Amino acid sequence: MLGLQIFTLLSIPTLLYTYELELLDLTRTPPEKELEYWCTYANHCRFCWDCQDGICRNKVFENHSPILENDYIANCSVFRRNEFCTYYVTSIKPHEVYRTECPQQSHEWHEAVIRKWQKLLTYGFYLVGCVLVANYVRKRSLQTVMYLLVLLVIFFLLSQLMLYRELEDKKHKIGSIPPKRELEHWCTHGKYCDFCWDCQNGICRNKVFKNHPPIGENDFIRHDCWTIHLSNKCYYQKIYKYPDYHMMECSQPTPYKWYDNLMKKQDIM
């Protein structure tokens, strides 16, 4: 009985910690429970329709009128990685790529509790530890020690969860314009992205590196760059004629060397 109680108490914070969206590998048939989400964004994908004898009926939205099977209904592949969801229209070449906002799992109910009792959890962690040691030294009661040990583990896991959620809040979600404090990082790697440049009347000046000479607005500056900042990796996607993904380490951005090297070469010449 004591073992079952310990297991139950330990499982609660563990479940909270792992309450995240599952990954979804690239597939043409997403899970049925997710069809409503995908068919809201990609209502022209074939997995949203049941087509028989040239007549197609929507699988999710029954009030949708039947339509004739035609080029509107396309073959699609979908996948999900943490904070972003993507679907490809595979019947078009080159493939068209679309990004959508993944449905967010709500952590608000336990985040509010954790934030409210943050100091209490910290003090409680030390208090239970002290009582645990004192009780073991004085009475050496195994049952009491086990209960206190369970409480100590719960306080520890809750504190880790609190720290984890704080780090989650600092992540930069998918977007076309990264935070200003991160511009130096992104413009080191994706120096041709439009958010790195201030363009007026066909003349573009770099927002981050003031020593960079003005350049004329041209195809070098991609006007569609998307950035994703996960816990330990950063991605940016440049969309110009066809999508192109780049990955880098967030914690160790490459120093801005390309312009310095160029200026040194010019000085030598």
Curated annotation (Swiss-Prot):
Conditions for induction? Expressed in the immediate early phase of the viral replicative cycle.
Extracellular topological domain ranges are 27-116, 166-269
User: Which sections of the protein are B repeats?
Assistant: 147-269
Question: Mind telling me which residue stretches traverse the membrane in this protein?
Answer: 117-137, 145-165
Renumbered ranges of A repeats: 1-145
This protein's GO CC annotations: host cell membrane; membrane
| Residue ranges, Cytoplasmic side | 138-144
Q: Signal peptide position in this chain?
A: 1-26
Q: Which residues are glycosylated?
A: N75
Q: What does this protein do?
A: Plays a role in virus cell tropism, and may be required for efficient virus replication in macrophages.
What protein family is recorded? Belongs to the asfivirus MGF 110 family.
Instruction: Return the protein name.
Output: Protein MGF 110-1L
Q: Which organism is it from?
A: African swine fever virus (isolate Warthog/Namibia/Wart80/1980) (ASFV)
